[in-house]
C-alpha cells in the first residue's frame, strides 16, 4: 500500500504540505483535508518518537518472539528480518562483503540446483543426454573416454580437468571482472544488480523490482540448503535425487536422513 510511504514522507518533510499547497489553487475542502491529514500524521509521529526506519512494517524472523531490532539493521536491503545473533553485520564493510557473497552464492546455488534436478527429470521422461546424475556426469572427465557435453561427442569432448578449470576461470573471471569494476565506462551503478538483462521487463516497476530482490534472496537461501543436501545425499547414498525421493516415500521409516547417516561408513 502507498499510505505508509506517504506517512513517512510527511513525517520527514513537515513543509511538504506547504510546498504542495502553495503553487496550486486548492478549494477549501481539499486544503482542509490535506492540512488535517498532515497535522494528524505529524502529531502521531511526535507522540511515538520513532525514526523513519521504524515506520516500515518489516516481518521479524521469529515474529513477536524476535526481540529488538539490531540498530544497524535498518531494513534497507532485501531479506532483512532482523536476525543477526552473531553480530556479523555490525560493521558496514563486513556487512557489504557478506551481503555480496550471499547474493552471488544464492544465484549460483539456484542454477546448480536446477542443473542437478532437470537432467534427472529428462532422463525419467526418456529424453536424457548421457549420464543424468550430476556427480556421476562430472566424474566422467576422469574416465578414459572423457566427458561429452549434453552426451553428444560432436559438441564438446572434454578430456582434461585442467582445460575445463581454465576455461571456467577465464569466462567467469571476465563476467565477474566486469561486474566488480562497474563496467569499462562505469555504467554499472550497483555491482549486485548490474542490469542490461531484463528482456521481460520485470524490473521496470520500482516496487516490483524490490519484491523480486526479496524473492531472489529467499529462493537463493533455499537453494543453498538444497545443494548442501544434494552433497550429503551423494556422499551417503550414492544415488540420484529422484531415486532417493522414491525410496523415502516408499518406506519412510527405513529410508530417511537418520537411518542413512547412522549406517554410513566412510570409504564404502
Swiss-Prot record:
Chlorophyll b 1 binds at residue 61. Chlorophyll a 2 binds at residue 105. Chlorophyll a 1 binds at residues 83, 89, 102, 221. The chain crosses the membrane at residues 108-125, 155-175, 222-238. Chlorophyll a 3 binds at residues 140, 150, 216. Its main location: plastid. Chlorophyll b 4 binds at residue 179. Chlorophyll b 3 binds at residues 160, 176. The N-terminus of the protein extends into the stroma where it is involved with adhesion of granal membranes and post-translational modifications; both are believed to mediate the distribution of excitation energy between photosystems I and II. Belongs to the light-harvesting chlorophyll a/b-binding (LHC) protein family. This is Chlorophyll a-b binding protein AB10, chloroplastic.
Amino acid at each position: 500500500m502507498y499510505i505508509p510511504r506517504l506517512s513517512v514522507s510527511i513525517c520527514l518533510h513537515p513543509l511538504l504540505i506547504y510546498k504542495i499547497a502553495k503553487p496550486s489553487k486548492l478549494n477549501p475542502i481539499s486544503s482542509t483535508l490535506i492540512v488535517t491529514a498532515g497535522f494528524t500524521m505529524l502529531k502521531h509521529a511526535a507522540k511515538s518518537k520513532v525514526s523513519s526506519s521504524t515506520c516500515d512494517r518489516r516481518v521479524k524472523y521469529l515474529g513477536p518472539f524476535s526481540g529488538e531490532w539490531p540498530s544497524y539493521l535498518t531494513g534497507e536491503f532485501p531479506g532483512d528480518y532482523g536476525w543477526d545473533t552473531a553480530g556479523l553485520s555490525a560493521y558496514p564493510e563486513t556487512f557489504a562483503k557478506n551481503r555480496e557473497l550471499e547474493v552471488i552464492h544464492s544465484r549460483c546455488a539456484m542454477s546448480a540446483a536446477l542443473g542437478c534436478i532437470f537432467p534427472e527429470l529428462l532422463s525419467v521422461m526418456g529424453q536424457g543426454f548421457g549420464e543424468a546424475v550430476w556427480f556421476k556426469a562430472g566424474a566422467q572427465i576422469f574416465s578414459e573416454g572423457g566427458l561429452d557435453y549434453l552426451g553428444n561427442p560432436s559438441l564438446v569432448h572434454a578430456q582434461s580437468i585442467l582445460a575445463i578449470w581454465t576455461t571456467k576461470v577465464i569466462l567467469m573471471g571476465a563476467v565477474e571482472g566486469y561486474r566488480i569494476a562497474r563496467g569499462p565506462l562505469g555504467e554499472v551503478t550497483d555491482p549486485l544488480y548490474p542490469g542490461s538483462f531484463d528482456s521481460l521487463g520485470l524490473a521496470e516497476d520500482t516496487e516490483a523490482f524490490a519484491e523480486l530482490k526479496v524473492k531472489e534472496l529467499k529462493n537463493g537461501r533455499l537453494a543453498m540448503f538444497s545443494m548442501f543436501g544434494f552433497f550429503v545425499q551423494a556422499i551417503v547414498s550414492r544415488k540420484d535425487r529422484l531415486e532417493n525421493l522414491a525410496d523415502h516415500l516408499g518406506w519412510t521409516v527405513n529410508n530417511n536422513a537418520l537411518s542413512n547417516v547412522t549406517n554410513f561408513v566412510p570409504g564404502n
